[in-house]
Structure formats: C-alpha cells, structure tokens
Amino acid sequence: MLKVIGGWGNREDSLQACAQRLQQSFEYIPADPQVYGPWGVWRQDASDNDRYELAPIDTTDRDVVTAAISAVTERVNNGPKATPGLNIELARRLLDNTSGASPIWLEYTARAGFIGMKRPFNHLVLTLEDGIDESVVTRAMSALVVAWEPDRLGVASQDVQRAQGHKPPEAVVGWLTYIKDGTQFDRDALDAEIVVHEADGGVYITVPGTPDDPSMEHIRRVRIALGYPNAD
C-alpha cells in the first residue's frame, strides 16, 4: 500500500475550518464509484463492542462532516476537548480488490489545529492502493496540498519510507513530493532526471520510476537537496 504523508507546524484551525478543508479535499480526490466505496466513519457495533463497521457519511453536508470530526476527537480524548486540536478518521473500501477475500480499507486521517507544540504535530495520511495510476496520485496530492496547505507532503510505501531513513519532521520523499515555499531546498543537488514543478505555493518534485517503485538513488538526491541525512 502507498501512503500520502504530510505535516505542518503549529497552526490554529477551528472545527469549521477543518470541516471546510476536508470537504475541499473531497472535491478533488478521485472518487470513482467503480473503484471506491463511499467515505465513512468507523462506528462500534451495538451488539459487539469489539467490532466496528464503516458507516457512510454525506461528505457534502457540512453539519455531518463537523459531527464526524467532533465524534472522533472526543473518542480519542475520552471526552470533550478543551484545548485546540482535532482528530479526523475516515475510510473507504477498495471495490476492485483482486488480492483476496478480505476487504481493503483506504484510510484518510489527520490531526489539525494543534498549537503550542514543541515539535510539528499537525499531520495527515491518505492511503492509496498498490498499482494506482500516476494521474490519480497527482490529483490526490494536489487536492491535499490545496486543502490543507501543508509544509511537506510525499507519497511512498512503508518500504521506501524506511529505506530512505525518514525521521519526523522530515518530508517523506517518494515518487512525488511537495515542499512549501521557504523550505531549504538546493536544486543544484538534483540531476536532470528529477523534475521540479512550481505550483500551489511550493514545488512538486518527481523522481524516475513509479509511485510503487521510485528510484531510491534519486530519492537520496532529493533528501540531500533538502538537507537530510541518508540511510547507510
């Protein structure tokens, strides 16, 4: 599985602001009904406390979205939260799963609105299926950048993330990576095979390969350009 992983520093976002950002991202994240089920939230089964079922929600209804965010935040905090910071947990089912009988759930999680943290705490993750088309990855990345305005965002598998020696709060460098304007970035460290495109208040960096199998050699070059150490 691939994950689009991003984050940003202290930034106050209200419940309404988070709901608006979430809805804005839904407008552009591909929602092919032949491929994906509807977005929903996990709810405990009334007859079995150890079982959770995905309950679809109307992502176009602001009240429904804000209620979903509030419910997750209260569950995470074991009650109403008095300090800034909200939690978002959504998922949808991959319908054309051919890998087996077990369903594949693609999750969309975020922490937003946190302030006064010693280290960056605002964070988002969107899970994507293996073998996904590059154009879908690009659209999902752009949707998240425009909606959440992160400092950094990248798409990579867990193996690629580990192989590069990633440590928070570094950007996860993958086949496609976004960094916000003002981030340390030495373009002279890159070669001609790495494509840099300016858009959405920052730059998108594409390395050779595919979303599932990007060039690790070029990922290391991008990490050098960002001032990060590389794994041995």
Regions picked out by a protein language model, each given a short descriptive name:
Residues V41-A156:
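Internal, hydrophobic cores of structured domains that mediate oligomerization or house catalytic pockets
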Residues M1-S47, A156-D232:
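C-terminal interaction module
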